Amino acid sequence: MATLEQMLDVGVHFGHQARKWNPKMAPYIFGERKGIHILDILQTAILLDKARVYARRQAASNGSFLFVGTKNQAASIVRFAAERCQKNDRSQAHYVNHRWLGGMLTNWPTMQLCIKRLLELESNHERGGFQQFPKKEAAVARKQLARLEKHLGGVKNMTGLPTTVVIVGQPQEMNAVRECEKLGIPMITMLDSDCNPLLTDIGIPSNDDSIASIELVMREITKGIEEGQWIQKEGREEATIEIEWFVVEPTPVEKPLVIIEPPPVEKPVLSK
């Protein structure tokens, strides 16, 4: 588990400018410094541990994960996280790091047809089949393969809906969030100060604009998945144990954060 010092070193606690915040994040904000919100790193540590334990339990139960992060800071990290988990089971971790296609989950049967086409083109290309096509048809096939690989390459091994979706950059991934909500798919989300904690199942207050911060959070979640994969592979009893967390989850406050200054202390008047 990452230490508080490690979290501070990578800037997990830095939020956005105070004027850009979401008031629903007030319970997770420690304070404000130079116009920047500072996230409560103690809650970050507690909720990150909760996410890791949840990921371990889901992986141990043969659950599957979909990592979603399409903004520049997150794209390569979510891909690496998913591919790291695929080393043990290619069907257990997937990613979307370019653009979320509408209906990716809610219209899954159609997506399956697109994935089937992608796999057919890949197989044909590997066998040198494109060389047998007329020049124009080969160019069209290569273009279609590149486009499908770009959008669906991270989910081509996904055989069904994921049991958990990991979100990095909630404001940018609202289409994915809405589809998960509609289908009742649990979400683990990095919550920066401009996010909505009510739109996730496990929220981790953290800086989702820093590459180092995203790497730390994703590393902890992937560790949990790998631990669960090992438990599932070994058939250990821990795979069926229900784990309880001691987590303080404050009720979201709708009012903006107000810092009340203590009244000045009057000096006593000494009588002569």
From Swiss-Prot:
SUPFAM superfamilies: Ribosomal protein S2. Pfam families: Ribosomal_S2. It is found in: Plastid, Chloroplast. Its main location: plastid. The keyword Ribosomal protein applies. Disulfide bonds: none annotated. GO terms for cellular component: chloroplast; mitochondrial small ribosomal subunit. GO terms for biological process: translation. InterPro entries: Ribosomal_uS2, Ribosomal_uS2_bac/mit/plastid, Ribosomal_uS2_CS, Ribosomal_uS2_flav_dom_sf. GO terms for molecular function: structural constituent of ribosome. Keywords: Chloroplast, Plastid, Ribonucleoprotein, Ribosomal protein. The keyword Mitochondrion does not apply. NCBIfam families: rpsB_bact (TIGR01011). Belongs to the universal ribosomal protein uS2 family. This is Small ribosomal subunit protein uS2c.
